[in-house]
């Protein structure tokens, strides 16, 4: 996750063929302590409700520069359908409340994130805003913000995910056009880390017991990968790895539990 967070206009979504998935999400310093304390502060009623389903009001924002980056309604609905399919077994569903389209070359080039979000962000801290941007810098496919305790108005406004436009179902980003980039980024919105270690070690990098230790990100779609022998094969099919879209098909029960905990601790009721 230690990747550049600077966004700049490099090329249109359809003109970049990504060699591998890249995500700019970085957990805040001391985040796991914040997570544990926020969850511990919940009352018995909240912690007993972890098996209840979660429905998230969702706002999709399409940023264009002229015709570059436009996404038709059919593909936006396909993105919501894909996310509902991917998260359904974990008890999470997304309800599309509104889609917006804004023709602004500056925002479509990934510049002025604060200005863009101040103008476009909708809903509350329990709402999901996804900004589809044709030009994310340095080959990034997406970036999203982790949930925080006691969010300020600025934190609420800056919340949400920025996703490359060409990664929606049927999009133009080769190997990453089944809508799973948004699924991956929303995982961070719901408190999930990457399944692999960021420093090449075989530690429990994602704080989830049923994802085996993994010392490196996955590239492509290998038949198998075992970067930490003895702990189980790598989670190459997990949405929180870096595999091709065709390779991704699962969250674990442990990840579903962490999502429920993060939702109750950070977003429910906000």
Swiss-Prot record:
Keyword rRNA-binding assigned: no
Glycosylated residues, chain numbering: 135, 199
Catalytic-site annotation from UniProt: 185
Subcellular location: Secreted
Classification via Pfam families: Peptidase_M43 (PF05572)
Entry's Gene Ontology molecular function annotations: metal ion binding; metallopeptidase activity
Chief location: secreted
Positions of the UniProt region annotated as Disordered: 208-227
Disulfide bridge positions per record: 221-247
One GO cellular component term: extracellular region
Polar residues: compositionally biased ranges: 212-227
CDD domains per the UniProt record, alphabetical: ZnMc_pappalysin_like
GO BP field: proteolysis
Keywords, sorted A to Z: Disulfide bond, Glycoprotein, Hydrolase, Metal-binding, Metalloprotease, Protease, Secreted, Signal, Virulence, Zinc
Signal peptide: 1-19
SUPFAM superfamilies per record: Metalloproteases ('zincins'), catalytic domain
E.C. no: 3.4.24.-
Residues holding Zn(2+): 184, 188
InterPro entries assigned: MetalloPept_cat_dom_sf (IPR024079), Peptidase_M43 (IPR008754)
Protein role: Secreted metalloproteinase that allows assimilation of proteinaceous substrates. Plays a pivotal role as a pathogenicity determinant during infections and contributes to the ability of the pathogen to persist within the mammalian host.
UniProt name for this protein: Extracellular metalloprotease MCYG_04966
Organism for this UniProt entry: Arthroderma otae (strain ATCC MYA-4605 / CBS 113480)
């Amino acid at each position: 996750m230690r990747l550049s967070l600077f966004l700049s206009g490099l090329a249109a979504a359809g003109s970049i063929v990504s060699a591998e998935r890249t995500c700019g999400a970085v957990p805040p310093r001391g985040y796991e302590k914040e997570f544990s304390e926020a969850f511990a502060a919940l009352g018995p009623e909240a912690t007993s409700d972890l098996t209840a389903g979660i429905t998230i009001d969702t706002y999709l924002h399409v940023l264009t520069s002229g015709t570059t980056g436009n996404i038709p309604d059919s593909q936006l609905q396909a993105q919501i359908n894909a996310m509902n399919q991917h998260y359904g077994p974990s008890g999470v569903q997304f309800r599309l409340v509104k889609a917006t389209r804004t023709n602004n070359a500056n925002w479509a080039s990934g510049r002025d994130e604060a200005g863009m979000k101040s103008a476009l962000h909708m809903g509350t801290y329990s709402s999901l805003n996804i900004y589809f941007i044709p030009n994310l810098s340095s080959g990034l496919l997406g970036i999203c913000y982790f949930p925080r305790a006691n969010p300020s108005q600025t934190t609420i406004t800056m919340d949400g995910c920025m996703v490359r436009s060409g990664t929606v179902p049927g999009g133009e980003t080769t190997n990453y056009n089944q809508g799973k980039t948004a699924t991956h980024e929303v995982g961070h919105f719901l408190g999930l880390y990457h399944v692999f270690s960021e420093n090449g070690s075989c530690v429990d990098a994602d704080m989830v017991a049923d994802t085996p230790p993994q010392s490196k990100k996955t590239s492509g779609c290998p038949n198998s990968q075992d970067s930490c022998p003895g702990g189980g094969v790598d989670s190459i099919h997990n949405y929180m790895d870096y595999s091709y879209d065709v390779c991704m098909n699962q969250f674990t029960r442990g990840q579903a539990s962490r999502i429920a905990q993060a939702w109750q601790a950070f977003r429910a009721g906000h």
